Protein backbone atom coordinates (compact mmCIF):
# COMPACT_ATOMS: atom_id res chain seq x y z
CA UNK A 1 0.00 0.00 0.00
CA UNK A 2 1.44 3.39 -1.02
CA UNK A 3 1.14 6.76 0.68
CA UNK A 4 -1.22 7.78 -2.16
CA UNK A 5 -3.82 5.08 -1.44
CA UNK A 6 -5.59 7.17 1.20
CA UNK A 7 -6.26 10.04 -1.19
CA UNK A 8 -6.83 10.80 -4.84
CA UNK A 9 -5.11 13.26 -7.14
CA UNK A 10 -7.06 16.25 -8.41
CA UNK A 11 -9.59 15.44 -11.13
CA UNK A 12 -10.59 17.50 -14.16
CA UNK A 13 -7.91 20.16 -13.69
CA UNK A 14 -7.44 22.58 -16.59
CA UNK A 15 -3.90 22.04 -17.84
CA UNK A 16 -3.75 25.46 -19.50
CA UNK A 17 -2.97 26.77 -16.02
CA UNK A 18 0.05 24.46 -15.86
CA UNK A 19 1.73 25.27 -19.18
CA UNK A 20 3.74 28.29 -20.28
CA UNK A 21 1.67 28.51 -23.47
CA UNK A 22 -1.52 28.74 -21.39
CA UNK A 23 -3.38 26.25 -23.59
CA UNK A 24 -4.58 22.69 -23.14
CA UNK A 25 -7.65 20.83 -21.95
CA UNK A 26 -8.24 19.11 -18.62
CA UNK A 27 -6.25 16.34 -16.99
CA UNK A 28 -8.27 13.31 -15.96
CA UNK A 29 -6.06 13.30 -12.87
CA UNK A 30 -3.29 15.66 -11.78
CA UNK A 31 -0.69 15.23 -9.03
CA UNK A 32 1.88 17.76 -7.83
CA UNK A 33 4.44 15.90 -5.71
CA UNK A 34 6.79 17.94 -3.55
CA UNK A 35 9.24 15.16 -2.64
CA UNK A 36 11.02 12.24 -4.28
CA UNK A 37 9.06 9.70 -2.25
CA UNK A 38 5.77 11.31 -3.21
CA UNK A 39 6.75 11.41 -6.89
CA UNK A 40 7.52 7.70 -6.90
CA UNK A 41 4.35 6.96 -4.96
CA UNK A 42 2.16 8.69 -7.55
CA UNK A 43 3.89 6.81 -10.37
CA UNK A 44 3.21 3.53 -8.54
CA UNK A 45 -0.39 4.63 -7.97
CA UNK A 46 -0.95 5.20 -11.69
CA UNK A 47 0.64 1.85 -12.52
CA UNK A 48 -1.58 0.12 -9.95
CA UNK A 49 -4.65 1.78 -11.50
CA UNK A 50 -3.55 0.65 -14.97
CA UNK A 51 -3.64 4.19 -16.31
CA UNK A 52 -1.11 6.13 -18.39
CA UNK A 53 1.18 8.53 -16.55
CA UNK A 54 2.63 11.58 -18.28
CA UNK A 55 5.16 14.04 -16.92
CA UNK A 56 4.36 17.68 -17.63
CA UNK A 57 7.20 19.01 -15.52
CA UNK A 58 6.67 22.74 -15.13
CA UNK A 59 4.74 22.97 -18.41
CA UNK A 60 7.34 24.51 -20.72
CA UNK A 61 8.16 23.00 -24.13
CA UNK A 62 4.75 21.31 -24.12
CA UNK A 63 1.69 21.58 -26.33
CA UNK A 64 -1.27 19.82 -24.73
CA UNK A 65 -4.34 18.96 -26.81
CA UNK A 66 -7.53 20.95 -26.26
CA UNK A 67 -9.31 17.72 -25.29
CA UNK A 68 -6.91 17.23 -22.39
CA UNK A 69 -5.12 14.08 -21.26
CA UNK A 70 -6.36 10.74 -19.93
CA UNK A 71 -4.68 9.11 -16.95
CA UNK A 72 -2.37 10.85 -14.51
CA UNK A 73 -0.52 14.06 -15.37
CA UNK A 74 2.48 14.57 -13.11
CA UNK A 75 3.41 18.21 -12.53
CA UNK A 76 6.87 18.47 -10.97
CA UNK A 77 7.06 22.22 -10.39
CA UNK A 78 6.91 21.73 -6.60
CA UNK A 79 9.76 19.19 -6.63
CA UNK A 80 12.42 21.80 -5.88
CA UNK A 81 15.67 21.97 -3.96
CA UNK A 82 19.40 22.00 -4.55
CA UNK A 83 22.68 21.48 -2.75
CA UNK A 84 25.96 22.81 -4.07
CA UNK A 85 29.59 22.44 -3.10
CA UNK A 86 31.53 25.59 -3.94
CA UNK A 87 34.82 23.70 -3.53
CA UNK A 88 34.24 20.79 -5.92
CA UNK A 89 31.65 22.44 -8.18
CA UNK A 90 29.14 19.65 -7.63
CA UNK A 91 25.47 20.67 -7.72
CA UNK A 92 22.70 18.24 -6.78
CA UNK A 93 19.29 19.51 -7.88
CA UNK A 94 15.75 18.13 -7.83
CA UNK A 95 13.99 17.86 -11.17
CA UNK A 96 11.48 20.67 -10.62
CA UNK A 97 14.04 23.34 -9.71
CA UNK A 98 13.69 26.27 -12.16
CA UNK A 99 16.72 26.64 -14.40
CA UNK A 100 17.05 30.41 -13.75
CA UNK A 101 17.16 29.72 -9.99
CA UNK A 102 19.85 27.09 -10.52
CA UNK A 103 21.90 29.50 -12.67
CA UNK A 104 21.67 32.31 -10.11
CA UNK A 105 22.58 30.10 -7.15
CA UNK A 106 25.57 28.69 -9.01
CA UNK A 107 26.80 32.15 -9.99
CA UNK A 108 26.52 33.42 -6.41
CA UNK A 109 28.70 30.49 -5.30
CA UNK A 110 31.35 31.28 -7.91
CA UNK A 111 30.49 28.23 -10.02
CA UNK A 112 30.90 28.80 -13.75
CA UNK A 113 29.01 26.86 -16.40
CA UNK A 114 25.31 27.73 -16.42
CA UNK A 115 25.32 31.46 -17.16
CA UNK A 116 23.79 30.78 -20.59
CA UNK A 117 20.70 29.18 -19.00
CA UNK A 118 19.50 32.19 -17.01
CA UNK A 119 16.45 32.94 -19.16
CA UNK A 120 15.31 29.43 -20.06
CA UNK A 121 11.70 28.89 -18.90
CA UNK A 122 12.10 25.32 -17.71
CA UNK A 123 13.33 23.01 -14.98
CA UNK A 124 16.51 21.06 -14.30
CA UNK A 125 14.79 17.81 -15.20
CA UNK A 126 13.41 19.20 -18.43
CA UNK A 127 16.82 20.60 -19.34
CA UNK A 128 18.33 17.13 -18.98
CA UNK A 129 15.62 15.53 -21.11
CA UNK A 130 15.82 18.13 -23.90
CA UNK A 131 19.53 18.93 -23.62
CA UNK A 132 18.41 22.53 -23.30
CA UNK A 133 20.78 25.14 -24.58
CA UNK A 134 21.18 28.81 -25.45
CA UNK A 135 23.84 31.31 -26.44
CA UNK A 136 26.43 28.67 -27.23
CA UNK A 137 25.96 26.57 -24.08
CA UNK A 138 24.04 23.36 -23.47
CA UNK A 139 23.10 21.05 -20.62
CA UNK A 140 25.20 18.12 -21.83
CA UNK A 141 28.42 20.07 -21.24
CA UNK A 142 27.84 20.28 -17.50
CA UNK A 143 25.49 17.44 -16.55
CA UNK A 144 27.21 14.54 -14.79
CA UNK A 145 24.28 12.21 -14.11
CA UNK A 146 20.53 11.93 -13.57
CA UNK A 147 18.46 9.84 -11.20
CA UNK A 148 15.41 8.35 -12.90
CA UNK A 149 12.47 6.04 -12.28
CA UNK A 150 10.46 4.08 -14.89
CA UNK A 151 7.05 5.57 -15.75
CA UNK A 152 5.49 2.15 -15.26
CA UNK A 153 6.86 2.04 -11.71
CA UNK A 154 9.82 0.30 -10.16
CA UNK A 155 13.12 1.19 -8.54
CA UNK A 156 14.97 4.40 -9.29
CA UNK A 157 18.48 4.24 -10.73
CA UNK A 158 21.23 6.51 -11.99
CA UNK A 159 22.33 7.20 -15.55
CA UNK A 160 25.72 8.76 -16.28
CA UNK A 161 26.28 11.39 -18.96
CA UNK A 162 27.77 8.90 -21.43
CA UNK A 163 24.61 6.78 -21.16
CA UNK A 164 22.27 9.61 -22.16
CA UNK A 165 23.14 9.77 -25.89
CA UNK A 166 23.17 13.55 -25.94
CA UNK A 167 22.84 15.38 -29.25
CA UNK A 168 21.47 18.75 -30.29
CA UNK A 169 18.26 19.22 -28.25
CA UNK A 170 18.11 15.48 -27.69
CA UNK A 171 18.78 12.76 -25.14
CA UNK A 172 17.72 9.14 -24.82
CA UNK A 173 15.34 10.30 -22.08
CA UNK A 174 13.00 11.51 -24.83
CA UNK A 175 12.47 7.94 -26.03
CA UNK A 176 12.73 5.97 -22.79
CA UNK A 177 9.76 5.89 -20.43
CA UNK A 178 11.75 7.38 -17.57
CA UNK A 179 11.01 10.22 -15.16
CA UNK A 180 13.94 12.38 -14.12
CA UNK A 181 13.89 12.81 -10.33
CA UNK A 182 17.14 14.71 -9.84
CA UNK A 183 20.31 15.73 -11.63
CA UNK A 184 23.95 16.24 -10.75
CA UNK A 185 25.99 18.96 -12.43
CA UNK A 186 29.75 19.39 -12.28
CA UNK A 187 30.58 23.10 -12.65
CA UNK A 188 33.85 25.02 -12.50
CA UNK A 189 34.56 26.40 -9.00
CA UNK A 190 36.69 29.36 -8.02
CA UNK A 191 35.26 32.06 -10.27
CA UNK A 192 34.41 35.63 -9.25
CA UNK A 193 30.70 35.72 -8.29
CA UNK A 194 30.41 39.37 -9.32
CA UNK A 195 31.73 38.59 -12.80
CA UNK A 196 29.39 35.62 -13.15
CA UNK A 197 26.49 37.82 -12.04
CA UNK A 198 27.48 40.39 -14.68
CA UNK A 199 27.45 37.71 -17.38
CA UNK A 200 24.11 36.22 -16.30
CA UNK A 201 22.55 39.69 -16.14
CA UNK A 202 23.81 40.47 -19.65
CA UNK A 203 22.52 37.14 -20.97
CA UNK A 204 19.09 37.70 -19.45
CA UNK A 205 18.96 41.23 -20.86
CA UNK A 206 19.77 39.86 -24.31
CA UNK A 207 16.96 37.30 -24.10
CA UNK A 208 14.37 39.78 -22.86
CA UNK A 209 15.16 42.25 -25.65
CA UNK A 210 15.37 39.75 -28.53
CA UNK A 211 12.54 37.37 -27.55
CA UNK A 212 8.83 37.87 -26.68
CA UNK A 213 9.55 37.43 -23.00
CA UNK A 214 6.30 38.97 -21.74
CA UNK A 215 3.90 36.83 -23.78
CA UNK A 216 2.93 33.20 -23.16
CA UNK A 217 5.05 30.88 -25.29
CA UNK A 218 6.97 27.60 -25.04
CA UNK A 219 10.31 29.18 -25.90
CA UNK A 220 11.81 28.25 -29.26
CA UNK A 221 9.38 26.13 -31.26
CA UNK A 222 11.69 24.65 -33.89
CA UNK A 223 15.12 23.08 -33.72
CA UNK A 224 17.72 24.80 -35.85
CA UNK A 225 18.55 22.79 -39.00
CA UNK A 226 22.24 23.39 -38.38
CA UNK A 227 24.09 25.34 -39.59
CA UNK A 228 20.95 27.30 -40.53
CA UNK A 229 18.72 29.11 -38.04
CA UNK A 230 15.01 28.27 -37.95
CA UNK A 231 14.05 31.81 -36.96
CA UNK A 232 15.91 33.29 -39.93
CA UNK A 233 14.26 30.86 -42.38
CA UNK A 234 10.81 31.69 -41.01
CA UNK A 235 11.43 35.43 -41.07
CA UNK A 236 12.71 35.28 -44.66
CA UNK A 237 9.34 33.79 -45.65
CA UNK A 238 7.59 36.87 -44.24
CA UNK A 239 5.77 34.83 -41.60
CA UNK A 240 6.32 37.13 -38.63
CA UNK A 241 2.93 38.26 -37.34
CA UNK A 242 1.05 35.43 -39.08
CA UNK A 243 -1.91 34.52 -36.92
CA UNK A 244 -4.33 31.62 -36.60
CA UNK A 245 -6.98 32.18 -33.96
CA UNK A 246 -5.23 33.54 -30.89
CA UNK A 247 -1.82 32.13 -31.83
CA UNK A 248 0.73 34.31 -33.58
CA UNK A 249 4.24 33.91 -34.95
CA UNK A 250 6.03 36.48 -32.85
CA UNK A 251 6.91 39.80 -34.44
CA UNK A 252 9.93 39.92 -32.11
CA UNK A 253 11.48 36.52 -32.90
CA UNK A 254 10.14 34.28 -35.67
CA UNK A 255 10.98 31.01 -33.87
CA UNK A 256 8.43 31.82 -31.18
CA UNK A 257 4.68 31.29 -31.34
CA UNK A 258 2.87 33.37 -28.75
CA UNK A 259 -0.58 33.20 -27.21
CA UNK A 260 -2.11 36.62 -27.76
CA UNK A 261 -4.80 35.93 -25.18
CA UNK A 262 -7.34 33.42 -26.44
CA UNK A 263 -5.31 30.83 -28.33
CA UNK A 264 -6.20 27.17 -28.38
CA UNK A 265 -3.80 24.29 -28.85
CA UNK A 266 -5.25 23.61 -32.29
CA UNK A 267 -4.33 27.17 -33.38
CA UNK A 268 -0.71 26.63 -32.37
CA UNK A 269 -0.59 23.20 -34.01
CA UNK A 270 -1.91 24.67 -37.26
CA UNK A 271 0.69 27.44 -37.18
CA UNK A 272 3.44 24.87 -36.62
CA UNK A 273 2.29 22.90 -39.67
CA UNK A 274 1.99 26.08 -41.74
CA UNK A 275 5.60 26.99 -40.98
CA UNK A 276 6.85 23.45 -41.64
CA UNK A 277 5.04 23.27 -44.98
CA UNK A 278 6.20 26.72 -46.11
CA UNK A 279 9.86 26.10 -45.25
CA UNK A 280 9.82 22.65 -46.81
CA UNK A 281 8.30 24.01 -50.03
CA UNK A 282 10.94 26.74 -50.24
CA UNK A 283 14.09 24.98 -48.99
CA UNK A 284 13.32 21.25 -48.98
CA UNK A 285 13.90 21.24 -45.20
CA UNK A 286 11.30 19.89 -42.78
CA UNK A 287 11.71 21.80 -39.52
CA UNK A 288 11.46 19.60 -36.43
CA UNK A 289 9.99 20.95 -33.23
CA UNK A 290 11.60 21.30 -29.85
CA UNK A 291 8.15 21.25 -28.29
CA UNK A 292 6.59 17.94 -27.26
CA UNK A 293 2.92 17.41 -28.11
CA UNK A 294 0.73 15.50 -25.68
CA UNK A 295 -2.66 14.13 -26.70
CA UNK A 296 -1.99 14.58 -30.42
CA UNK A 297 -1.62 11.78 -32.97
CA UNK A 298 2.00 12.86 -33.45
CA UNK A 299 4.23 13.74 -30.49
CA UNK A 300 6.78 15.78 -32.47
Swiss-Prot record:
Gene: murB
Pathway the protein takes part in: Cell wall biogenesis; peptidoglycan biosynthesis
Necessary cofactors: FAD
Family classification: Belongs to the MurB family.
Catalytic reaction annotation: UDP-N-acetyl-alpha-D-muramate + NADP(+) = UDP-N-acetyl-3-O-(1-carboxyvinyl)-alpha-D-glucosamine + NADPH + H(+)
Gene Ontology cellular component list: cytosol
PANTHER family named in the record: UDP-N-ACETYLENOLPYRUVOYLGLUCOSAMINE REDUCTASE (PTHR21071:SF4)
Active site as annotated: 169, 220, 290
Protein name (database record): UDP-N-acetylenolpyruvoylglucosamine reductase
Gene Ontology molecular-function annotations: FAD binding; UDP-N-acetylmuramate dehydrogenase activity
Keywords: Cell cycle, Cell division, Cell shape, Cell wall biogenesis/degradation, Cytoplasm, FAD, Flavoprotein, NADP, Oxidoreductase, Peptidoglycan synthesis
Residues covered by the FAD-binding PCMH-type domain: 22-190
HAMAP family, sorted: MurB
Alphabetical GO biological process terms: cell division; cell wall organization; peptidoglycan biosynthetic process; regulation of cell shape
Entry's EC annotation: 1.3.1.98
Keyword Oxidoreductase: yes
Cell location: Cytoplasm
Function: Cell wall formation.
Plastid among keywords: no
Amino acid sequence: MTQCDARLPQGGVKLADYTTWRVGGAAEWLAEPASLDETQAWIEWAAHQGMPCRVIGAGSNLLIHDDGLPGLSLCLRKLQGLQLDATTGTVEVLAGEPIPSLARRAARAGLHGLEWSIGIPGTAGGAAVMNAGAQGGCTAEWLESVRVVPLEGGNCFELQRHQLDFAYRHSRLQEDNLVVLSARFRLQPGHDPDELKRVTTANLSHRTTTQPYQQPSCGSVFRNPEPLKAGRLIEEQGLKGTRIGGAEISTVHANFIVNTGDAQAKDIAQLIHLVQDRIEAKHGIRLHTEVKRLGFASAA
